UniProtKB/Swiss-Prot annotation:
The keyword Transcription regulation applies. GO terms for cellular component: nucleus. This is Transcription factor Sox-14. Residues 8-76 bind DNA. The gene is sox14.
Length: 239
């Protein structure tokens, strides 16, 4: 690499004047010694010198400086910058090691933390539009035949066991129908072929006679139902 023509060297100081001869001598005595080690030893020896021993080298440095200023009156020290390619190489002197599977971000999460993250994602899914769901909840192809059969039997089971007043609320035939207006005797029931959809039907509307809750009677020998039923006894007295 050729040096620029306009580059002017700095004048030597007292240490450089002294070390110029000492460096050559030390390099001849220790040919395998690195240049940086030679500079370190020369610096240590220079500090051990007294002021009287340094005086001739200080005077020589002043003379060289005066001569340098006379030859280059407009001289200004401009340090040379490193080329850009060297700067790029120095940037990657200490590359980061690959941690692989020992990454603490992978192994540090416990099962509870993972479950909480999954639960948070499911809660966030509730605020998304329906089209963003990975699958349709009403798509019958997502369910097996056993699941569909259980879903069709579920309304009848609930109406017969857990809803004793289902008949008075318009749940006819054990199906989950919507309460409609008295003038329109139309209810909706789950489709037997596709439980995800409901279909209307024209079943009979609930009447006032169905509003009476079911009553269980215990009859002993010699007793009749008329004596126990207040509604029927009042009706007989009115007649």
């Amino acid at each position: 690499m050729s040096k620029p023509v306009d580059h002017i060297k700095r004048p030597m100081n007292a240490f450089m004047v002294w070390s110029r001869g000492q460096r050559r001598k030390m390099a001849q005595e220790n040919p395998k010694m690195h240049n940086s080690e030679i500079s370190k030893r020369l610096g240590a020896e220079w500090k051990l010198l007294s002021e009287a021993e340094k005086r001739p080298y200080i005077d020589e440095a002043k003379r060289l400086r005066a001569q340098h200023m006379k030859e280059h009156p407009d001289y200004k020290y401009r340090p040379r910058r490193k080329p850009k390619n060297l700067l790029k190489k120095d940037r990657y002197v200490f590359p980061l090691p690959y941690l692989g599977d020992h990454d603490p971000l992978k192994t540090g999460l416990s099962m509870s933390a993972t479950d909480s993250l999954l639960g948070a994602s499911e809660k966030a899914r509730a605020f998304l539009p329906p089209t963003s769901a990975p699958y349709s909840l009403l798509d019958p192809s997502q369910f097996s035949s056993t699941t569909i059969q259980k879903m069709t039997e579920m309304p009848h089971t609930l109406a017969a066991s857990t809803l004793p007043y289902a008949s008075t609320l318009g749940y006819q035939n054990g199906a989950f129908g919507g309460l409609s207006c008295p003038s329109q005797h139309t209810h909706t029931h789950p489709s037997p072929t596709n439980p995800g959809y409901v279909v209307p039907c024209n079943c009979s509307a609930w009447s006032a006679s169905n509003l009476q809750p079911p009553v269980a009677y215990i009859l002993f020998p010699g007793m009749t139902k008329a004596g126990l039923d207040p509604y029927s006894s009042a009706h007989t007295a009115a007649m």
